[in-house]
Design a protein with these regions (language model features):
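Secreted/extracellular ectodomain signature
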Residues: 21-134
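Sec-dependent N-terminal signal peptides
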Residues: 4-15
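Sec/Tat signal peptide C-region and signal peptidase I cleavage site
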Residues: 16-20
């Protein structure tokens, strides 16, 4: 019985999702032209790749993104990328978007700000401007 209980406990520990807090970006930010281009590229994905996370510096100049190349992806550990951003820019960095939902809290955007991958570049830029990111 102890053996079965130990195995069940081990399986639960190995298969559980991590609910650690993600460092979401906050504060006023204006995306640079390059960051906007990267965001558009990230939102659209290529082939079977699906957007996973878009990391941004608080000055809007540094950005990077993660893709999910498989169907059932779990969130990755973005902290090394956020730390690299902070080391490179000497500013605060955080997650700007998870999948196609903008998480950055600038006090202007609506709670549920989602970018459609079928929107044109101009439509995406217009929404970013409306939400206070341009």
């Amino acid at each position: 019985m102890k053996k079965i209980l130990s195995i069940v406990l081990l399986i639960l520990l190995l298969c559980s999702n991590s609910y650690a807090a993600v460092k979401k970006g906050k504060g006023e930010v204006t995306l640079s032209n390059q960051s906007v281009d990267w965001l558009i590229q990230y939102i659209r994905g290529k082939g079977s790749k699906k957007p996973m996370a878009f990391i941004l510096s608080s000055n809007g100049a540094w950005s990077s993104y993660w893709y999910c190349g498989e169907g059932a992806c779990r969130d990755g550990n973005f902290m090394p990328t956020i730390r690299k951003c902070e080391a490179d820019t000497d500013t605060e960095c955080g997650i700007f978007a998870r999948r196609r939902t903008i998480l950055w809290d600038n006090g202007v955007k609506p709670k549920k700000a989602v970018i459609n991958s079928k929107w044109s570049d101009q439509e995406i830029k217009d929404k970013l401007k409306e939400w206070g990111f341009l």
